[in-house]
Amino acid sequence: MTIVLSKPGVDGLSEAVGALREWQTDEAPLQLHPGDLGWFWRAGAEATAAAVRTWSRDGRILAVGLLDAPDLVRLTTAPDAQQDEELARQLVEDMAEPERGVLPAGKVYVEAPTGARVRDLLFEARWNADEPWTPLRRDLTEPVKNPGVRIEVIGPERAHVRAAVHRASFGSPKFTDRRWHMMAAGLAYADARCLVAYDDQDNAVAAVTVWSAGPGKPGLLEPMGVHQDHRGHGYGTAISVAAAAALQQLGSSCALVCTPNSNVGAVATYESAGFQRLPQRLDISRCFSG
């Protein structure tokens, strides 16, 4: 059967999110998660739909891609399609040809799960290994300790607090209250929570959003940040522990997060919160035009 590349539109986002939820397993390498779409949803449903690509055969979605930036597609496939030769070749062709609407000409990047056949074919097509990332995982079968600081679960009336901590953590003015509400209106946020940590003076010092993929499946931290005025006091560790506890309450089997190798502080923070490093994953890039 022919493999069909599609832009699902707003009405098709539920099917893409559902596929990503289904594909999350403890055995799979870190991959595109419904929470990644959920976090992108801060730009609105229409923008999220415009950034999603699906590949289907005989009516079944086999792969989902998220254009997390104009030059970056984050891609994963159904577990039983990881080694599907026809699918992998179609993915490579579609990502190589700008007119197909996946990636533009010039320098572009692909994120794909370690071990997926599409990675092998990209390297055969003269794509290159690029930025290394460190995935980390925390098992949630055992009770999670108290984080040692006050934690607030943020609802709509307190969105301004979550947004302010994010802006102060990442130096980005874009995450406004309005963006929080757009994110919270998205399909994936039904299984998500926003948490804020406070210090002894009741200052909001760190924040995280956690995304469940359903009971018994891996959950995701995306994003986590510590207010620039309150770093160096262990609040990143505390909010990461609180994130693990929240995912445990949501029924997640484990908590996952991924950060660039170059962000050694973040890696150390997650490790101090009980996360264990997984084998690094390399992005893949193309410098030629097609």
Regions found by a protein language model. Give the residues of each.
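Short glycine/proline-centered loop/turn elements that form peptide/ligand docking sites
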Residues: 180, 240, 263-266, 285-288
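Conserved hydrophobic beta-strand within the GNAT/NAT acetyltransferase core sheet
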Residues: 108-110, 221, 255-259
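A structural microfeature
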Residues: 63, 131-132, 205-206, 279
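Conserved donor-binding loop and adjoining core beta-sheet/short helix segment
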Residues: 23-99, 208-219, 227
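A short beta-loop-alpha structural element at the N-terminal edge
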Residues: 1-18, 150-163
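Conserved acetyl-CoA-binding loop-helix of GNAT-fold acetyltransferases
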Residues: 83-97, 223-228, 232-249, 267-272
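Acyl-donor-binding surface of acyltransferase catalytic domains
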Residues: 69-148, 282-286
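Flexible, substrate/cofactor-facing loop regions flanked by secondary structure
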Residues: 34-37, 143-219
